[in-house]
UniProtKB/Swiss-Prot annotation:
Gene Ontology molecular function terms on file: metal ion binding; unfolded protein binding
Name the record gives this protein: Chaperone protein DnaJ
Subunit structure: Homodimer.
Transmembrane segments: none
UniProt comment concerning the protein's domains: The J domain is necessary and sufficient to stimulate DnaK ATPase activity. Zinc center 1 plays an important role in the autonomous, DnaK-independent chaperone activity of DnaJ. Zinc center 2 is essential for interaction with DnaK and for DnaJ activity.
Primary role: Participates actively in the response to hyperosmotic and heat shock by preventing the aggregation of stress-denatured proteins and by disaggregating proteins, also in an autonomous, DnaK-independent fashion. Unfolded proteins bind initially to DnaJ; upon interaction with the DnaJ-bound protein, DnaK hydrolyzes its bound ATP, resulting in the formation of a stable complex. GrpE releases ADP from DnaK; ATP binding to DnaK triggers the release of the substrate protein, thus completing the reaction cycle.
Record note on cofactor: Binds 2 Zn(2+) ions per monomer.
Length: 287
């Protein structure tokens, strides 16, 4: 089968990998090829889609088992083994199989195909519902809850585990269609904190006087405000680092917060400020 995808190879894990290993492998690869970190890179975008698909299937025990049965079937050149109920002849294309496995489409099967597999697969998968869930970076790091309004009017309160990454899925049992599951793909909300891998980017507006002289300032972080000493002679775009104030890593450690300096020129001046700027200009011109 030409378009078959080996999900274990995509994630770089053995077929015996447990759920923790699958999750860790996905997190590592997702940070490397996330579209936000590779703007305009089509290869990275396609790679991210593939590893997300691999994680979506391998992280679910039922889907993983179905995928492995499908793999064995086609490795045997489409011949169902004696005494086996598995017959995947209705799926000549791997993408069609994945679409049904993820509930994207329903494939009409021959009535002679396995009744056990047909009933179990189409019944279970056709009822799952997939939606996106936006979570602010602070809640994603520390854990908490988020609300989601569904099309049918239901308002769900979703528990967010601490350290969840963009692209990961949360499964709500029984909240899909006709008792199926609701799969929520986590997306980080746009905010003053931009998560890039395990680092967090924050832009700090700095006055001309503070940029020239430096000094103590209060900087917001995901953990709350902290004091930071700015060096003198700062440039707009210069980056400073707050160690350990970034996002969580699979190891449990934290990345850093990168503070990007943005020079903020005053739009209105008091008489005293204008006088001081005029004096400064005179000094500069007399050099």
């Amino acid at each position: 089968m030409q378009n078959f995808r080996d999900y274990y190879a995509l994630l770089g894990i053995p077929q015996s990998a447990d759920q923790a290993a699958i999750k860790a492998a996905f997190r590592k690869l997702a940070r490397q090829c996330h579209p936000d970190l590779n703007p305009g890179d089509r290869q990275a975008e396609e790679r991210f889609k593939q590893i997300s698909e691999a994680y979506e299937i391998l992280s679910d025990p039922d889907r993983r088992a179905e995928y492995q049965r499908f793999s064995r079937y086609w490795q045997q050149q489409g011949a169902a083994s004696v005494g086996s109920d598995d017959d995947y002849g209705d799926f000549p294309d791997f993408d069609i199989f994945v679409d049904e496995l993820l509930g994207r489409r329903t494939v009409e099967r021959s009535p002679r195909r396995s009744a056990r597999r047909s009933a179990a697969t189409s019944s279970a998968l056709s009822r799952d519902l997939e939606r996106s869930l936006e979570v602010d970076p602070k809640t994603a790091l520390q854990g908490g809850s988020a609300q989601l309004q569904l099309e049918d009017g239901r308002l769900l309160e979703v528990d967010i585990p601490a350290g969840i990454q963009a692209g990961e899925y949360l499964r709500l049992r029984g909240q899909g269609i006709k008792g199926g599951d609701l799969l929520l793909r986590v997306q980080l909300q746009a905010s003053n904190f931009q998560v890039q891998g395990s680092d967090v980017i924050y832009t700090l507006n700095v006055s001309p006087a503070m940029a020239v002289l430096g000094g103590q300032v209060t900087v917001p972080t995901l953990d709350g405000p902290v004091q930071m000493k700015l060096p003198a002679s700062l440039r707009s775009g210069q980056r400073l680092r707050l160690a350990g104030k970034g996002y969580s890593k699979p190891s449990g450690d934290r990345g850093d917060q990168i503070v990007v300096i943005q020079l903020q020129l005053p739009t209105r001046l008091s008489p005293e400020e204008r006088q001081l700027y005029e004096q400064l200009r005179s000094l500069e011109q007399s050099r």
